[in-house]
Amino acid sequence: MRWTHLLLPAILLLPAMLGIASPACAHAFLLHASPPVGSELPVSPSAVTITYTEGVEPDFSSIEVDNAQGSRVDKADPHLLNGDQTKLSVSLPKLPPGEYTVVWHVTSVDTHKTEGRFTFSVTP
């Protein structure tokens, strides 16, 4: 019976010792943005698309684009790009020159919530 006291902890610790990570520990972070973070564009983009490190739930996620005065300028239509759960996109009207702030909030497929913001500019 004494050997079971030693064996049980070893069995329970085996996944950690092998480096097996639980998928529940993951979060959806910004991997890539189009337009790129901090970019200066000569023309207005037609959309903002963010690629995340894992899939997101579009019904519980958002991307908002605000102008320098803080007014929302996107078309309020966040959607998965081509059905890819890692790519959330929002359409834009033709934007005048200026600086824009992208604010995003996502819930990943494992229900973790993350958020962030970045800017881009449309130059005259």
Residue map of PLM features:
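Short, surface-exposed alpha-helix to beta-strand junction/turn motifs within ectodomains of secreted
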Residues: 48-50, 54-76
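Bacterial N-terminal signal peptides
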Residues: 9-19
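N-terminal edge beta-strand
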Residues: 25-44
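Extended, polar beta-sheet/loop recognition surfaces of beta-rich domains
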Residues: 47, 51-54, 111-124
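A glycine-anchored, Pro-Gly-centered beta-turn/N-cap motif
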Residues: 91, 96-105
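N-terminal signal peptide c-region/cleavage motif recognized by signal peptidases
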Residues: 21-23
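Short strand-edge motifs at loop-to-beta-strand transitions and within beta-strands
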Residues: 86-90
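Bacterial N-terminal signal peptides that target proteins for export
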Residues: 1-11
